[in-house]
């Protein structure tokens, strides 16, 4: 069981009744708290939880409509996402209890200060390298909309400026990361047809490709509902249309692709996790048509080239700079 869940269960008497577990891990916590419900935005966690606790977990970027008497937020990595979620919960919990749990290395001590606008926060427990904090919501805020927290910015591309709309919790919120910048300089001569932007994030790559190659069918896929919501806003801001999917890795992608384009993630919360990218490299061949291309950007220190050559085909480095490389391989 996740150590954060273990800390909650040390105080199980506090968590009886109508409780909302927000950003919960895919463990057995719901089994231990039979009256609780979950809310998550990670498609993999949602699938795992729904398989075991069908109908008890809501998915998406908005708090579920069903009433709850208390809520526990599992601290996310991004401070601005924490602010959004705490506001959404506290606005529904006037006079009731809001809890925050997280790992010490994830910044729970500092994050606990984000409870102070709602009342006097106190630490209830510290164990398993985690902390549990609680506040009685004395100052319930007005709920803010997610879109009001968006950070739009423009990037200059070969065919003109592109507007990117970034939401809290999305990778490189409010700015273009160096890996994507390098990949955007190298989206020439892509195969025509169906293109997948894998790990789409803000949607900057998929939107740029759709505008440059308007006759291509672009599919944008991410495991995170905040990312796919951001991608939809980016498309709308540029008057573009594409299919946007929230799903758990390459297994959620369609078959028969001509191109897979990606700046793949390698972090889950505060943890490094290469599994999604390695799974992409192992299975990309199954999703690509013969002659289809995998083109991705990765940090120099990540040794993806041997894996690409083993599972996709001969791999070349198309470009490199700023600590990143662009890899390209065509399915034979």
Swiss-Prot record:
One term of GO molecular function: 16S rRNA (guanine(1207)-N(2))-methyltransferase activity
Main subcellular localisation: cytoplasm
CDD domains, sorted: AdoMet_MTases
SUPFAM superfamilies, alphabetized: S-adenosyl-L-methionine-dependent methyltransferases (SSF53335)
Pfam families referenced in this protein's UniProt entry, alphabetically: MTS (PF05175), MTS_N (PF08468)
E.C. designation(s): 2.1.1.172
InterPro entries per UniProt: Mtase_sm_N (IPR013675), rRNA_ssu_MeTfrase_C (IPR023543), RsmC/RlmG (IPR046977), SAM-dependent_MTases_sf (IPR029063), Small_mtfrase_dom (IPR007848)
Keyword flag RNA-binding: no
Protein keywords: Cytoplasm, Methyltransferase, rRNA processing, S-adenosyl-L-methionine, Transferase
Compartments reported by the entry: Cytoplasm
Swiss-Prot/TrEMBL catalytic activity: guanosine(1207) in 16S rRNA + S-adenosyl-L-methionine = N(2)-methylguanosine(1207) in 16S rRNA + S-adenosyl-L-homocysteine + H(+)
Any one of the GO CC terms: cytoplasm
Function: Specifically methylates the guanine in position 1207 of 16S rRNA in the 30S particle.
Assigned protein family: Belongs to the methyltransferase superfamily. RsmC family.
PANTHER family: RIBOSOMAL RNA SMALL SUBUNIT METHYLTRANSFERASE C
Subunit and partners: Monomer.
Record-given protein name: Ribosomal RNA small subunit methyltransferase C
Source organism (scientific name): Pseudomonas savastanoi pv. phaseolicola (strain 1448A / Race 6)
